[in-house]
A protein has these predicted regions:
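Adenine nucleotide-associated cytosolic modules
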Residues: 1-251
């Protein structure tokens, strides 16, 4: 860590829970962010600002006018430009001292496994169940911590899932790939609610990477109308085909 790094990250280095050792861990880490929408854009901003050494930004979509209500990396001038490229540009302006990789593609199959294998933490910021299940399967197979979130209307949810998956995985809670009837596309979403959830994904990643204990194996539910939180303990599903021990499918 050089003098420039020390000055840039000084406000979090002052924290006893992070300090120089924790900051160096962040600088040495790689985070994969899949999905650069209402969750992924605030998460990416805070992780870049915090000095996570390598960020891999994956999204195959372009910026649309309807995105601008909540996807805070983008401006009106970015409409029809690839989200991953715009994100790379903006985050480079914020922090040119970190490594940024833009993947203008939908990560599936071997490409997904390869990206997950290189990451210390994966942020699932996607918006469909099939992709979430595929990300979860790859993370469990490769023992990579997964931080997943979603939001619709005034509500959000967040989970931190870590090896050895004693509290289960995403598949344990949602055993199929069918999207819920109520989601961002059908029910709408309040911008700050999805921003809260994406920001919390970044916070949990910083805690994991810097060695701060974080509550894993919980489903955390946020009600934006009442500003209240609820936490539900997760349980490993018997015979889960992804993490269910001897009953798991081979990968």
């Amino acid at each position: 860590m050089n003098d420039r790094d020390f000055m840039r990250y000084s406000r979090q280095i002052l924290l006893d829970d992070i300090a120089l050792d924790g900051q160096q861990k962040l600088l040495d880490s790689q985070v994969l962010i899949i999905g650069l929408g209402g969750l992924g854009t605030p998460a990416a901003l805070y992780l870049a600002g915090a000095g996570v050494g390598t960020l891999v930004l994956a999204d195959d979509d372009d910026v649309h006018l309807s995105n601008l209500q909540r996807q805070i990396l983008f401006t009106t001038e970015d409409i029809d430009r690839p989200k991953s490229q715009v994100s790379h540009q903006r985050l480079t302006q914020l922090n040119p001292d970190i490594q940024l990789t833009a993947l203008q593609q939908r990560l599936t199959s071997e490409a997904l496994k390869d990206a997950v294998a290189r990451a210390d933490v994966v942020l699932d910021c996607t918006d469909n169940m099939a992709t979430r299940q595929e990300i979860n399967t790859a993370c469990v197979a490769l023992n990579t911590p997964l931080i997943t979130a979603s939001a619709a209307g005034f509500g959000g949810q967040l989970m931190v899932l870590t090896p050895p998956w004693e509290q289960g995985c995403y598949r344990c809670l949602w055993p199929d790939t069918q999207d819920p009837e109520r989601n961002c596309r059908t029910a709408g979403v309040v911008g700050p609610v999805v921003g809260v959830m994406g920001t919390l994904q970044a916070l949990e990643a910083i805690k994991l990477l810097s060695g701060i204990e974080t509550p894993a194996g919980e489903l955390r539910l946020f009600d934006g109308k009442s500003s209240q939180w609820r936490s539900l303990a997760l349980r490993r599903a018997t015979g889960c085909p992804v993490c269910g021990g001897s009953n798991a499918d081979p990968v």
